[in-house]
Amino acid sequence: MAEKAPPGLNRKTSRSTLSLPPEPVDIIRSKTCSRRVKINVGGLNHEVLWRTLDRLPRTRLGKLRDCNTHESLLEVCDDYNLNENEYFFDRHPGAFTSILNFYRTGKLHMMEEMCALSFGQELDYWGIDEIYLESCCQARYHQKKEQMNEELRREAETMREREGEEFDNTCCPDKRKKLWDLLEKPNSSVAAKILAIVSILFIVLSTIALSLNTLPELQETDEFGQLNDNRQLAHVEAVCIAWFTMEYLLRFLSSPNKWKFFKGPLNVIDLLAILPYYVTIFLTESNKSVLQFQNVRRVVQIFRIMRILRILKLARHSTGLQSLGFTLRRSYNELGLLILFLAMGIMIFSSLVFFAEKDEDATKFTSIPASFWWATITMTTVGYGDIYPKTLLGKIVGGLCCIAGVLVIALPIPIIVNNFSEFYKEQKRQEKAIKRREALERAKRNGSIVSMNLKDAFARSMELIDVAVEKAGESANTKDSADDNHLSPSRWKWARKALSETSSNKSFENKYQEVSQKDSHEQLNNTSSSSPQHLSAQKLEMLYNEITKTQPHSHPNPDCQEKPERPSAYEEEIEMEEVVCPQEQLAVAQTEVIVDMKSTSSIDSFTSCATDFTETERSPLPPPSASHLQMKFPTDLPGTEEHQRARGPPFLTLSREKGPAARDGTLEYAPVDITVNLDASGSQCGLHSPLQSDNATDSPKSSLKGSNPLKSRSLKVNFKENRGSAPQTPPSTARPLPVTTADFSLTTPQHISTILLEETPSQGDRPLLGTEVSAPCQGPSKGLSPRFPKQKLFPFSSRERRSFTEIDTGDDEDFLELPGAREEKQVDSSPNCFADKPSDGRDPLREEGSVGSSSPQDTGHNCRQDIYHAVSEVKKDSSQEGCKMENHLFAPEIHSNPGDTGYCPTRETSM
């Protein structure tokens, strides 16, 4: 029969992993529980077997299985969900399809629509080398990659050249930069565009004037009878030259690098466009004589011819002309090959046609050099017709020359055309890239685009997440303060545990934490297990939430619930020393050894009484006589009567006598009554047991099978105050708390009985009982355990019982339970117990004389469904020392699921 969740408890909810990273054991469990794993890449889910990813262990996905901590997982993936066994990668989902197929088939292919550089980046991210590409995709991948790298290199060079224009080392850098952009970058502003248009108009006007000056109708005759330029056209040309000169000088003055400016091809063209005009004026005005004038006139004619170079100034404003020039410069190999082929063909065919036509009358092929012209126009398929062969042999040579010319010219021309096309596209792309870069810079200056480093953005987002978590925690505390206690998830603290702690030989780590609050008579004994890998994480969470919800709702008085405020705690130290007393023979009571849970006083008292000892802690040898038992637990500072009630050890009920609180004193057991003498200031505070009616019948000797006497001990209590107040922390944290240590010594063996104490796990999971119970519950730890005889069994009376248990853990945290401790702890356990009742009709939870009933608090959460059959498997040969057995005390749902790879080890009990 499954347990029912308390009202308001959502059993499907798990611990929030938004702010608290999971334990390594939870990560390992999530990976081992399933053979498949979900890979979410860019929102596209893929499901693959773990063994498929193990084929490439050095890749990113291959390392995913070996990551068992939160930090290592975030180094491999971007996010993960352990409940869904899903890992998220914020990458290109299309490229991941090819990569995942490589894990499955061992064949790596690149999709047709993928960019080569993008696919290469994806391969680098997933840790796969590009050499694994198949031959069908490798050529295409490398070709596209080389092409893109070349374009990026050129773009980087262009941008570096433009960014290298620094004006910081010159005078008036801002003004010079603006002037340089105005003259060299027509697209930088509207004024620059207007200036470029005006410059183009001047170039066209100068070219037209140069052409019109050659018309005889417009020319003028001087005194020497020579034709000169028209005066009106000369004035137009002078204005154009003045504009060109001013433009050239402004470019030179505003240029960041003067030498680089002189070497520029466009600047050389500008200089050649204006230089002949000034040379002509200088030569004409300096030589007035007739003889000198005739010589100078020839030179001037040469410079006048150079004026036609002004048309090349249009290349500054034309991308096509710039592409043509750069294409010829980049295609010099192809051009050289073309010229070589033509030269060889001309030489061969001119020689052949000369020997074929030299014997003819009135032949025009008089020599081989004279035949070059025919071979050239024939190979280029021009054919002017001014010279041609007449003989049959000469015509055959002419036909072969035409075919050879077509083949020779046709081979390198396509290469030159492709270069021109590619360079033209590249020029256009670079112009757009420059415009885009300038637009982005303007947008950044205007604040339209915010540039941020990815690491800074991630750090900022993490800070916002922390703030959101803190705000959520504060709002939860203020809104649900009535239902919030120290077990609520809002008060959980994260404590990193090493893997060695969770996998050590210790099966359980006993921790104690006492909660004593203002206006509350409730005492909680919370324990934590350091081996959560034996149970399912989801069930641990469900049980933990169940305990959290059950305790506040089971309290009859809502005012007695926990408040967020906690008074400061102080430290008590109780030491236990042996007191030599006369040995007496203890009468052996003829009572039957209890081997069934039905004969115990309470199921809850039995299920919470098991102590765990490792194999190294069990020793048949008696411990040293001068042994000490230190019990540490936090208590509250006395301030009110309620604080005085809750100040003692766990499950220790002090008398309600008036008087000042004692700090130091001695706690002893009287022969008849169990009392606590606190004689720090002369006052005493008695501890009275509600189980005094059965003192004489229960003797420790009754359970001993030997005649070894039991030493009597005195009890001394030392209280030490610790003023520093510490907040209530969950049991899972490993931080030291203000504790109370107690040392007890037994003065009268007649008042000693045995109870099995077991910690209540903090998350509701109940570990399988496994303990070796000795006569006085032997618990050696680091030389601090008391001396006892051999490990024997106590027979329990059917009536009331008192107990003393020593528990030792690896963290030196001990527990103490005295008579009357369950007055406020346990009254009714039936609401949450779903197991079948004993057949004899008696309710073991209501056994007479078992506990006092001063508080109606429900402790049913300590019960589970198969609790009555827990000890029924104990054999009757419990008198044999060291007998071990398996104890299946709890519900089957506590154990690991059959599908889980984790194991749930059984515990051992020696009865």
From Swiss-Prot:
Phosphorylated. Phosphorylation at Ser-608 of the FFAT motif activates interaction with MOSPD2, VAPA and VAPB. Residues 508-522, 560-569, 837-849 have a biased composition (Basic and acidic residues). The keyword Transmembrane applies. Residues 523-534, 685-711, 851-860 have a biased composition (Polar residues). Keywords: Cell membrane, Cell projection, Glycoprotein, Ion channel, Ion transport, Membrane, Phosphoprotein, Potassium, Potassium channel, Potassium transport, Transmembrane, Transmembrane helix, Transport, Voltage-gated channel. It catalyses: K(+)(in) = K(+)(out). A motif (FFAT) lies at residues 605-611. Glycans are attached at N287. Residues 1-22, 503-534, 549-571, 637-665, 685-739, 760-865, 892-911 are annotated as: Disordered. Residues 213-232, 285-296, 355-368, 389-395 are extracellular. The keyword Glycoprotein applies. Coiled coil: none annotated. The modification Phosphoserine is found at S448, S608. Belongs to the potassium channel family. B (Shab) (TC 1.A.1.2) subfamily. Kv2.2/KCNB2 sub-subfamily. Homotetramer or heterotetramer with KCNB1. Heterotetramer with KCNS1 and KCNS2. Interacts (via phosphorylated FFAT motif) with VAPA and VAPB. PANTHER family: POTASSIUM VOLTAGE-GATED CHANNEL SUBFAMILY B MEMBER 2, VOLTAGE-GATED POTASSIUM CHANNEL. This is Potassium voltage-gated channel subfamily B member 2. It comes from Homo sapiens (Human). The gene is KCNB2.
